[in-house]
Amino acid sequence: MSKQQKKEVEQRRCFGIISHPDAGKTTLTEKFLLFGGAIQLAGAVKARKAARHATSDWMSIERDRGISVTTSVMTFSYRDFFINLLDTPGHQDFSEDTYRVLTAVDSALMVIDSAKGVEAQTEKLMEVCRMRNTPIITFINKMDRDGMAPLDLLSDIEEKLQIECAPLTWPIGAGKGFAGVYNLYKKELQLFTAGGKTRQKDGIVIQDLDDPKLAELIGESKAEELREDIELLEGAANPFEMEHYLSGSQTPVFFGSAINNFGITELLDALVEMAPAPGLRPAESRDVSPLEEDFSGFTFKIQANMDPAHRDRIAFVRICSGKFNRGMKVMHHRIGKEMIISNATMFMAQDRANVEEAWPGDIIGVHNHGTIKIGDTFTIKEPLKFTGIPNFAPEHFRRVMLKDPMKAKQLNKGLTQLAEEGAVQVFRPLTSADNILGAVGVLQFDVTMARLKAEYNVDCIYEAIDYNTARWVECPDNKMLDEFRKANQANLALDGEGQLAYLAPSQWRLGFVQENWPDVVFHKTREYN
């Protein structure tokens, strides 16, 4: 390990933003880029009727619907730190893609709408974070709108998510009377005006809450309310404990309004000062340190057609150790072949730049013509396999039928590419030539339909089919597995990677089959090979 490598790793931050739909996540992403100098002007974010679209929502279906359905990777600098930000899908039907993103980050930022508190999707994503003990910072957004009282919001988070809250900033007023935030750990007050579309300048700083100037700036009633709140918090709130945050048991909480630039600086400061630098990554044989000399990384996402004009596919690779150099030769372990990575890119949403070098914690894009899949590991020599990137059993199914039988080749190509991205799962029954799509949420079918038509010129009919869930099956006894296949072939299919799966018409039927075949193992998730 060189001094440069140690310094580069310490300066890296890789985090994902998670939230319920419409909590303001994409707006916050844009403001981070704005404050980091990556973009000059924030878009008219999420104005659903506006012609413009948010910088990070670049796929046409996202612009049309005003939701994020794929993961955007964005890179920017703030202070002396190099930040890799993963803007995850907020829509509940895309939790599978979000989960895969959470395997690539070192920490997460949870965005909560002050008017709604903790919502269902946030709870689901929190479960995923807890599986990995991911450190989480919380941003309570939209304080410039009428919402729940700050103390009620903290209680809501603690009760529903079973995580201790440690507020680090505190709002002054709310709704139309929102005047700024008080920084509890720096003991200073920052007042803001709505920033509109440009970066907000630093606010006025007041070190002492008893300063008469405070009342002049925000009014006596707000000043008195703030003093009372801070006195109450100093006695009742949980003090921030770095160790508890890093273990995932405590979340520091910040208040603000992303669209008006309230509280963004404090949040960015916390992300570089508190959030962890890249750490150990689990592989099948051992844990891998970012300070190791040899390069290693894994693919957590495939995105087809980022530029429809070029029909390209990009593999998103998280670097786990060593240093990446342009043109370096690596071993692609799943297929056992060496490859030269000469055209890696980094991202600012749809914009890309060629990479000469990259370090642990960075996300690079590798051009891919179908040989790279989710979960693939690249190293200089050691045959590592990083773990914890699963497929989830789908809960919704559709049969795909072509309107024009002459387009079968385009359909197969489109389905193969979309399945490798993880946008949808494809099952091919043992007893028919059907294509059956499986998804965690029904919106994935709409996205698949739109993308097949727009990117592959394929028009299909999507027919509901009587399946309720799927399980991947395996049995160490080949003779018994053959008997199982013969007895249940009407419900068996191969997934996109050729793995055998049982498609169940109901939970009762699944339980019945499991009971009758106790030596066959039924898996609810499957690691990417």
UniProtKB/Swiss-Prot annotation:
Residues 10-279 form the tr-type G domain. CDD domains: RF3 (cd04169), RF3_II (cd03689), RF3_III (cd16259). InterPro entries: EF-G-like_DII, EFG_III/V, G_TR_CS, P-loop_NTPase, PrfC, RF3_C, RF3_dom_3_sf, RF3_GTP-bd. Keywords: Cytoplasm, GTP-binding, Nucleotide-binding, Protein biosynthesis. Transmembrane segments: none annotated. GO terms for molecular function: GTP binding; GTPase activity; translation release factor activity, codon nonspecific; translation release factor activity, codon specific. PROSITE patterns: G_TR_1, G_TR_2. It comes from the Bacteria. It is found in: Cytoplasm. GO terms for biological process: regulation of translational termination. One of its GO terms (cellular component) is cytosol. Signal peptide: none annotated. GTP binds at residues 19-26, 87-91, 141-144. Its main location: cytoplasm. Belongs to the TRAFAC class translation factor GTPase superfamily. Classic translation factor GTPase family. PrfC subfamily. NCBIfam families: prfC, PRK00741.1, small_GTP. Increases the formation of ribosomal termination complexes and stimulates activities of RF-1 and RF-2. It binds guanine nucleotides and has strong preference for UGA stop codons. It may interact directly with the ribosome. The stimulation of RF-1 and RF-2 is significantly reduced by GTP and GDP, but not by GMP. HAMAP family: Rel_fac_3. This is Peptide chain release factor 3.
